[in-house]
Amino acid sequence: QMSRSGGPNFLGAQYAPFIISENPDSKGFRVRDVSIPESIVGDRAENRRELRANLDRLQRINDKIANDPAVSIDGYYEQGYKLVYSEKAQAAFDISKEPEETRKKYGRNSFGQRLLLARRLTEVGVPWVTVYNGGWDHHSNLFKTCKDKALPTLDTGMAALMEDLAERGTLDNTLVVCLGEFGRTPKINKNAGRDHWSF
């Protein structure tokens, strides 16, 4: 149960999010969890898949004999295998294929490139994408931080996303929601910031 980290909670592991922790704006960006390790080439991947399937079969036989039915995770393995070896998925995650002009339009920062990646994922059929943009907890120096960094990053990235979706004809069937979770006091504190409501 990972309520604070955006996990599936009571829904169960099958509804857990696929989290990309790598920064898409970093040089040589690749999503580790969908990248084929360089050491696994040729038939090695298929051999490993068959070995795992055989071991799983033995485990199910053992569980049946011990009258201890375990929850099968074969479907998860299969889903992961298809994702890693899918050319469509690999292409969607490869934002280096985007023209530099497009990448700059979104903003050459983590948030902007995550929005670009989100657009690419929706184009290949991913029904739900969440992009996180932290750094809004301004207890001090609120005006300068927002004016110089936080707001331009948000504005540039969101404007590029909306424009891109409209140009590609997908805006009409895409719901874009931009929200924050902070409830702030309207009063500016002595450090030129805003604090949380005290309950």
What are these regions (language model features)?
Residues 1-199:
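Ligand-binding pockets and gating/stacking loops
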